Amino acid sequence: MVHGLKGRHRDFWVATKSFTHRQVPPVRTHVEFRSDAFPAQPGEDEQINPGRWGKVLAEYLRSALTQRGLPGGEPFAEDWGWCIPLENEKFPLWVGCGNYEDYPDGFLCFIEPSKPVVRKLFSKIDTTRRVEQVASALESALLAHGGVRELRWWSEH
């Protein structure tokens, strides 16, 4: 018996205690896949580091995510690839994408924030529901493309 609790009250306490003090279920934040449909564009490696590309993928994802109810801004170059900012009121939210060195036709997309909770001033914001919405829309967009294969999700944490 846990602290004098019996039956379902004990079960609730144990379930609540184990969830709140242990790990939060992992959120899908990173997806890798293979495709020949998103080639490097001429001069793209001048916008980002040599050997990096993903502009065609970023433009496709921006359009596809907007169609799935996740509008955002223009993709912009980073040194690692491309960033697609998404409209979100409570915390900064974006998808990063670019080629993935493990395969000549490999790509990686990742959602930020990748943590289940972010801090804003003195409060904690649960990101899991919104990040999972982005993950579902991202998966739907990639699978709908037809040129995407070997899709595999993983979590950074």
Annotate the PLM regions:
Residues F91-E101:
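Broad, structure-driven detector of short, well-ordered beta-strand segments within folded domains
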Residues S35, N88, I111-P113:
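Short beta-strand-to-loop capping motifs
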Residues P75-P92:
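Ser/Thr-rich, low-complexity intrinsically disordered terminal regions
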Residues M1-P26, N99-H157:
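Acidic, proline/glycine-rich low-complexity IDRs
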Residues T16-Y60, T66, L70:
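N-terminal low-complexity, intrinsically disordered segments
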Residues G72, L93-V95, R149, W153:
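Generic structural motif
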Residues H30, P92, G106-L108:
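A residue-level signal for beta-strand positions that form part of recognition/binding surfaces
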